[in-house]
C-alpha cells in the first residue's frame, strides 16, 4: 500500500455563515486557500439551539455539490428551491448535486 505524507494540518476556525449559524471551518479559510476544488468544509455541532436555529436564507446552489455526513444527532434539511425536506440521522450521508 502506498503511503501518503501529511504536508500540513489545518486547524478549523470558529466562523458563522447564513443567518448567523455558528460552525467550525477548516477548508475555506485563508490558511487553506490553496485547496481546490473545495469551497468550504464546515463542522456544525452544538447542543445550544440558538447556535444554528436561524439557518441559511435562500441562496444559490448552481453548479455545486453538497455532501453531508452526520456523526451524531439528527437534523432536518429543508430546500427552498424544491420545497422538499429530508431528515438525517446519525451515521447517514447525503450527497446533492446542483447542475441547473
Residue ranges and their predicted role:
Residues 1-24:
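Hydrophobic alpha-helical membrane-insertion signals
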Residues 5-8, 31, 43, 65, ...:
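Glutamate identity and glutamate-enriched acidic tracts
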Residues 16-71:
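A short glycine-rich, His/Asp/Glu-containing loop-to-beta-strand
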Residues 53, 65-89:
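A short beta-strand-loop-beta hairpin characteristic of the jelly-roll/cupin
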Residues 59-61, 77, 97:
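Histidine-centered active-site/metal-ligand motif
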Residues 87-100:
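Conserved metal-binding segment of the jelly-roll/cupin
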Amino acid at each position: 500500500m502506498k503511503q501518503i505524507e501529511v504536508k500540513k494540518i489545518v486547524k478549523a476556525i470558529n466562523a458563522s455563515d447564513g443567518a448567523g449559524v455558528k460552525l467550525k471551518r477548516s477548508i475555506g479559510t485563508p490558511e487553506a486557500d490553496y485547496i481546490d476544488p473545495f469551497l468550504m468544509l464546515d463542522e456544525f455541532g452544538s447542543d445550544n439551539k440558538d447556535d444554528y436555529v436561524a439557518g441559511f436564507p435562500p441562496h444559490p446552489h448552481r453548479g455545486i455539490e453538497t455532501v453531508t455526513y452526520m456523526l451524531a444527532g439528527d437534523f432536518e434539511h429543508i430546500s427552498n428551491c424544491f420545497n422538499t425536506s429530508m431528515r438525517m440521522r446519525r451515521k447517514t450521508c447525503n450527497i446533492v448535486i446542483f447542475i441547473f
